[in-house]
């Protein structure tokens, strides 16, 4: 029996050391050297070096002077990140969407873009399609007393064109540009 136990325990200890300690340390070291910003959470800092958020996680911006992110089923909390898991036939989902659409439609004119009414799969998607950002420009321009053309130019600057997929705008980056205009 001892002939079987000792090799099994040795192999278990070796594999635990390799896969539980050495491999994670090696991957972390390579990531810190090759991709330091991404390895540390893609943190976004303001002009004073203060962390304002992550480029990968949406935030709840309140008030008419800010561009708003998609709705979040988990209140923008990373611990509770998930979709609402409500089916399209669920009355609670229909009521939330109707309420959001009515609020957005009162503030603006025209049909509300779908991205401003639906949550993302994670509930934390920081990006919006350019059309959803453009829909909010008149509200933000009026609240901040800025020319619409200036906000359109900022939107163009903040629009990302990924290799695969449609263009998107990072709402945190766009709101940071607006905040810099105020200073």
Swiss-Prot record:
| One Pfam family recorded for the sequence | KdpC
Task: Name the HAMAP family for this protein.
Answer: KdpC
Subcellular location per the Swiss-Prot or TrEMBL entry = Cell inner membrane
Record GO terms (molecular function):
ATP binding; P-type potassium transmembrane transporter activity
List the keywords (alphabetical).
ATP-binding, Cell inner membrane, Cell membrane, Ion transport, Membrane, Nucleotide-binding, Potassium, Potassium transport, Transmembrane, Transmembrane helix, Transport
Give the residue spans that cross the bilayer: 11-31
Name the family the entry cites.
Belongs to the KdpC family.
Q: Which gene encodes it?
A: kdpC
**Assembly and binders:** The system is composed of three essential subunits: KdpA, KdpB and KdpC.
Its biological purpose: Part of the high-affinity ATP-driven potassium transport (or Kdp) system, which catalyzes the hydrolysis of ATP coupled with the electrogenic transport of potassium into the cytoplasm. This subunit acts as a catalytic chaperone that increases the ATP-binding affinity of the ATP-hydrolyzing subunit KdpB by the formation of a transient KdpB/KdpC/ATP ternary complex.
| Record-linked InterPro entries | KdpC
A single cellular component GO annotation: plasma membrane
Protein name as annotated: Potassium-transporting ATPase KdpC subunit
How does this chain sit within the bilayer?
Answer: Single-pass membrane protein
**The species this protein was found in:** Pseudomonas putida (strain GB-1)
């Amino acid at each position: 029996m001892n002939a079987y136990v000792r090799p099994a325990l040795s192999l278990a200890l070796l594999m635990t050391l390799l896969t539980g300690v050495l491999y994670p340390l090696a991957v972390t070291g390579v990531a810190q050297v090759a991709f330091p910003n991404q390895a540390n959470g893609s943190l976004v800092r303001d002009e004073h070096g203060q962390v304002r958020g992550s480029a990968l996680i949406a935030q709840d911006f309140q008030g008419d002077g800010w561009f708003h992110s998609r709705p979040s089923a988990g209140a923008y909390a990373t611990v509770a990140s998930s979709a609402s898991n409500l089916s399209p036939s669920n009355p609670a989902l229909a009521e939330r969407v109707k309420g959001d659409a009515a609020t957005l439609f009162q503030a603006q004119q025209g049909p509300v873009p779908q991205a401003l009414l639906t949550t993302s799969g994670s509930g934390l998607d920081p990006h919006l399609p350019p059309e959803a950002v453009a829909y909010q420009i008149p509200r933000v321009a009026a609240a901040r007393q800025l020319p619409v053309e200036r906000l359109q130019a900022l939107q163009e600057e903040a629009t990302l064109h990924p290799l695969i997929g449609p263009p998107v705008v990072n709402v945190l980056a766009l709101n940071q540009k607006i905040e810099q205009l105020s200073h």
